[in-house]
Amino acid sequence: MITALVALLVFISLGLVITVPVALATPGEWEASKSTFTRAFQAWVGLVIVIAAADGISSAI
């Protein structure tokens, strides 16, 4: 389970690393898609917290 969560985290991170600089470099694109990036950032932070909790629980067992 943790491996799948980490893989998802890697894919979201790769997507953000590629798309955010492109959106910032393209005139007007950041304003148009700011809410989408905000949701992606929130998902990324949430996933980090879920992975930390899952790892803590699995190591305590």
UniProtKB/Swiss-Prot annotation:
<keyword id="KW-0604">Photosystem II</keyword>
<protein>
    <recommendedName>
        <fullName>Photosystem II reaction center protein Z</fullName>
    </recommendedName>
</protein>
<keyword id="KW-0602">Photosynthesis</keyword>
<dbReference type="GO" id="GO:0042549">
    <property type="term" value="P:photosystem II stabilization"/>
</dbReference>
<dbReference type="GO" id="GO:0009535">
    <property type="term" value="C:chloroplast thylakoid membrane"/>
</dbReference>
<keyword id="KW-0793">Thylakoid</keyword>
<dbReference type="GO" id="GO:0015979">
    <property type="term" value="P:photosynthesis"/>
</dbReference>
<keyword id="KW-0674">Reaction center</keyword>
<dbReference type="Pfam" id="PF01737">
    <property type="entry name" value="Ycf9"/>
</dbReference>
<dbReference type="InterPro" id="IPR002644">
    <property type="entry name" value="PSII_PsbZ"/>
</dbReference>
<comment type="function">
    <text>May control the interaction of photosystem II (PSII) cores with the light-harvesting antenna, regulates electron flow through the 2 photosystem reaction centers. PSII is a light-driven water plastoquinone oxidoreductase, using light energy to abstract electrons from H(2)O, generating a proton gradient subsequently used for ATP formation.</text>
</comment>
<keyword id="KW-1133">Transmembrane helix</keyword>
<keyword id="KW-0150">Chloroplast</keyword>
<comment type="subunit">
    <text>PSII is composed of 1 copy each of membrane proteins PsbA, PsbB, PsbC, PsbD, PsbE, PsbF, PsbH, PsbI, PsbJ, PsbK, PsbL, PsbM, PsbT, PsbX, PsbY, PsbZ, Psb30/Ycf12, at least 3 peripheral proteins of the oxygen-evolving complex and a large number of cofactors. It forms dimeric complexes.</text>
</comment>
<feature type="transmembrane region" description="Helical">
    <location>
        <begin position="38"/>
        <end position="58"/>
    </location>
</feature>
<dbReference type="InterPro" id="IPR036512">
    <property type="entry name" value="PSII_PsbZ_sf"/>
</dbReference>
<keyword id="KW-0472">Membrane</keyword>
<dbReference type="GO" id="GO:0009539">
    <property type="term" value="C:photosystem II reaction center"/>
</dbReference>
<comment type="similarity">
    <text>Belongs to the PsbZ family.</text>
</comment>
<keyword id="KW-0812">Transmembrane</keyword>
<feature type="transmembrane region" description="Helical">
    <location>
        <begin position="5"/>
        <end position="25"/>
    </location>
</feature>
<keyword id="KW-0934">Plastid</keyword>
